[in-house]
Amino acid sequence: MGLKADSWIKKMSLEHGMISPFCEKQVGKNVISYGLSSYGYDIRVGGEFMLFDNKNALIDPKNFDPNNATKIDACKEGYFILPANAFALAHTIEYFKMPKDTLAICLGKSTYARCGIIVNVTPFEPEFEGYITIEISNTTNLPAKVYANEGIAQVVFLQGDEVCEQSYKDRGGKYQGQVGITLPKILK
């Protein structure tokens, strides 16, 4: 299994639509950086957030109640205020179409981590297609800004030694083709 370089990421994105929209260079002046890097791609967070703000609720991943969260549009302000010790969901600006022989892993950016903002994203499985739902936690006792339309995490691509027998698409993955923020799902 090999870590893929910028030239491979660029080729797969421009010729096969792996990342769209695709930024061929790293943009980093006066913004939290995004775009192509040496061995990865820095993704951007969109302007829509879902804040988990019902203090009297129980979060149950097997029976999620959407009333436990509030949608917030941060496009006008350009940022979202994540309250102290709070959790929110968001989604990427980029749409992904993963190759069948490749898995991607996403790691939060150090700029946010150094401010106590932790970003979690599960792996992008072979042949997954869709926007990425991003989990964002504020681990501090202070409110924190998360900037819309700027970098939030870095994706690294690992190509398998052989093609998997069954991809995410083949299995009918429950988040296949997701658009916007996608809440937890359990197949029944």
From Swiss-Prot:
<protein>
    <recommendedName>
        <fullName>dCTP deaminase</fullName>
        <ecNumber>3.5.4.13</ecNumber>
    </recommendedName>
</protein>
<comment type="function">
    <text>Catalyzes the deamination of dCTP to dUTP.</text>
</comment>
<dbReference type="GO" id="GO:0006226">
    <property type="term" value="P:dUMP biosynthetic process"/>
</dbReference>
<keyword id="KW-0546">Nucleotide metabolism</keyword>
<keyword id="KW-0378">Hydrolase</keyword>
<feature type="binding site">
    <location>
        <position position="168"/>
    </location>
    <ligand>
        <name>dCTP</name>
    </ligand>
</feature>
<comment type="subunit">
    <text>Homotrimer.</text>
</comment>
<dbReference type="InterPro" id="IPR011962">
    <property type="entry name" value="dCTP_deaminase"/>
</dbReference>
<dbReference type="GO" id="GO:0008829">
    <property type="term" value="F:dCTP deaminase activity"/>
</dbReference>
<keyword id="KW-0547">Nucleotide-binding</keyword>
<feature type="active site" description="Proton donor/acceptor">
    <location>
        <position position="135"/>
    </location>
</feature>
<feature type="binding site">
    <location>
        <begin position="109"/>
        <end position="114"/>
    </location>
    <ligand>
        <name>dCTP</name>
    </ligand>
</feature>
<comment type="pathway">
    <text>Pyrimidine metabolism; dUMP biosynthesis; dUMP from dCTP (dUTP route): step 1/2.</text>
</comment>
<dbReference type="Pfam" id="PF22769">
    <property type="entry name" value="DCD"/>
</dbReference>
<dbReference type="InterPro" id="IPR033704">
    <property type="entry name" value="dUTPase_trimeric"/>
</dbReference>
<feature type="binding site">
    <location>
        <position position="154"/>
    </location>
    <ligand>
        <name>dCTP</name>
    </ligand>
</feature>
<feature type="binding site">
    <location>
        <position position="178"/>
    </location>
    <ligand>
        <name>dCTP</name>
    </ligand>
</feature>
<comment type="similarity">
    <text>Belongs to the dCTP deaminase family.</text>
</comment>
<dbReference type="GO" id="GO:0000166">
    <property type="term" value="F:nucleotide binding"/>
</dbReference>
<dbReference type="GO" id="GO:0015949">
    <property type="term" value="P:nucleobase-containing small molecule interconversion"/>
</dbReference>
<dbReference type="GO" id="GO:0006229">
    <property type="term" value="P:dUTP biosynthetic process"/>
</dbReference>
<dbReference type="InterPro" id="IPR036157">
    <property type="entry name" value="dUTPase-like_sf"/>
</dbReference>
